[in-house]
């Protein structure tokens, strides 16, 4: 006989947080949003943590390299979409990883015997004004000088001059050994009023550059999420078909964390994928899995070896899985159930597996509700699709700007692998739509605003960290009438009155 859940399936919109006691310490400036991204054992630190509880969805219309960089600057992680060729996805990951400043391997190098024309051509090709001059013209050759735009004046030169005649020679450069830390390098740059600092090894070979502009950028983005080499943390999506070829390419490209992109994670296909990763990489490659909506699904993926588990089926704004197939669960109910299973699993095994709430976030206050219900972080699609940094076109419709946004199960994305249950036969119907979302400006401005609301609400609950919020939060179901009561009501708002007068 079929199993029936006793409780009605609820969404975030049906809940409110009841305020708790707030001490004088409970101010937004004191709130920390740091949260684990991957599993860890009791008493240990997670291998990767987020500085903000946000990751971007594995979607063509959301997670490109530009958004990956922008989100990492704010402290989150973008999962580059996997519904593209292996080579294209790996290249996108590599470009995002290599964007970051810090210790940068030089990609603009030239020999002393090259000419000014060669310098100009190299600058036009790479877009960089700082060019390393090495004996053999390689990125790790013996450094003999540097050429910048200050070293030559095109209008007064023929173009045939050798680089050695106008470069700044090594003896006039300030350099640092390869044992120098990033902080020490930045101090040297500051003290000597430099724009760049070459880092050389004991043999005088060039290892890296450290640039002033990257120090300035870090000051503007104190929460930026970096790996051990001071590069941005970047994620990537994989599927349950070509993982044996895709994963090695993504690891080689520098992906810090992977995630199986599937609408339904309670399947043998996901456990096979996770088993392959553990067999070939052990715990060195971090892989999230999902999506599931109940305790049983969570435990299945936990035992299969998932590093984090995504919750949600059919709750995304462009997802029509519930409509076409009749499967899913209200996001709030699913999240509460799975997080309870997560906590019990932690008590029993001593292993904490982070839970990601994927879908159903419509308003900013839904973010706080999801975190209070137990989510460690949120995967957002529509939210990020609205921004300048998403990879879609911005278009004007009747004077209003929109961004294109389509689901991975739509005909446009043709990412049937996400919705396949395996086997050779491909699905032939859509589970996502092609749509528009209102254009909202830059990622930084919007994320700052959204998280300021999250922090403010956490203070209302007397919490300064996400775990503290989950411990102290008091949630109540609301009726349809109280939902209406919660907004502006029984007044004529001024903008409406202005429209009526026209």
Predicted segment positions?
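Alpha/beta catalytic cores of nucleotide-metabolism and tRNA/nucleoside-modifying enzymes
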Residues: 1-21, 108-111, 176-177, 183-187, ...
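Short beta-strand/loop segments at the ligand-binding rim of alpha/beta enzyme cores
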Residues: 47-56, 102-107, 227-236, 278-293, ...
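Bateman/CBS regulatory modules and CBS-like beta-alpha motifs in cytosolic regions of diverse proteins
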Residues: 27-50, 57-59, 88-128, 133-136, ...
């Amino acid at each position: 006989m079929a199993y029936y859940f006793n409780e009605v399936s609820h969404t975030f919109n049906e809940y409110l947080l009841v305020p708790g006691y707030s001490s004088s310490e409970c101010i937004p400036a004191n709130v920390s949003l740091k949260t684990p991204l991957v599993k860890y054992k009791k008493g240990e630190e997670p291998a990767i943590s987020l500085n903000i509880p946000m990751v971007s969805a594995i979607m063509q219309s959301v997670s490109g390299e530009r958004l990956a960089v922008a989100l990492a600057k704010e402290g989150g992680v973008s999962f580059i979409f996997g519904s593209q060729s292996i080579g294209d996805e790996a290249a996108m990951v590599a470009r995002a990883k290599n964007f970051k400043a810090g210790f940068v391997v030089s990609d603009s190098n030239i020999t002393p015997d090259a000419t000014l024309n060669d310098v100009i051509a190299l600058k036009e090709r790479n877009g960089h004004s700082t060019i390393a001059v090495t004996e053999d013209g390689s990125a790790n050759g013996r450094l003999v000088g540097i050429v910048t735009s200050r070293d030559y004046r095109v209008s007064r030169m023929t173009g045939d001059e050798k680089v050695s005649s106008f470069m700044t020679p090594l003896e006039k450069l300030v350099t640092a050994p390869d044992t120098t830390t990033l902080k020490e390098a930045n101090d040297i740059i500051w003290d000597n009023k430099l724009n760049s600092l070459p880092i050389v090894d004991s043999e005088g070979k060039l290892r890296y550059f450290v640039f002033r502009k990257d120090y300035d950028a870090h000051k503007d983005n104190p929460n930026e999420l970096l790996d051990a080499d001071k590069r941005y943390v970047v994620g990537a999506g994989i599927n349950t078909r070509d993982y044996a070829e895709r994963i090695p390419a993504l690891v080689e490209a520098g992906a810090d964390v992977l995630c199986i992109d599937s609408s339904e994670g309670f399947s043998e296909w996901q456990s096979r994928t996770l088993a392959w990763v553990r067999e070939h990489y052990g715990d060195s490659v971090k892989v999230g899995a999902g999506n599931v909506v109940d305790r049983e699904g969570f435990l299945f993926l936990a035992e299969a070896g998932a590093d984090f588990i995504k919750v949600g089926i059919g709750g995304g704004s462009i997802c029509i899985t519930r409509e076409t197939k009749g499967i899913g669960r209200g996001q709030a109910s699913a999240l509460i159930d799975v997080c309870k299973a997560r906590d019990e699993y932690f008590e029993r095994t001593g292993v904490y597996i982070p839970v990601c709430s994927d879908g159903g976030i419509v308003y900013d206050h839904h973010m706080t509700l999801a975190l209070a219900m137990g989510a460690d972080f949120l995967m957002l699609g529509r939210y990020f699709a609205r921004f300048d940094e998403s990879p879609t076109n911005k278009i004007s419709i009747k004077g209003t700007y929109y961004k294109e946004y389509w689901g991975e199960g739509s005909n446009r994305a043709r990412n049937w692998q996400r919705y396949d249950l395996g086997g050779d036969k491909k699905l032939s119907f859509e589970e996502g739509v092609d749509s528009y979302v209102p254009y909202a400006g830059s990622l930084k401005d919007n994320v700052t605003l959204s998280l300021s609301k999250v922090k403010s609400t956490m203070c209302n609950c007397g919490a300064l960290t996400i775990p503290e919020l989950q411990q102290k939060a008091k949630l109540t179901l609301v009726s349809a009438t109280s939902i209406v009561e919660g907004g502006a009501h029984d007044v004529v708002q001024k903008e409406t009155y202005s429209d009526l007068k026209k």
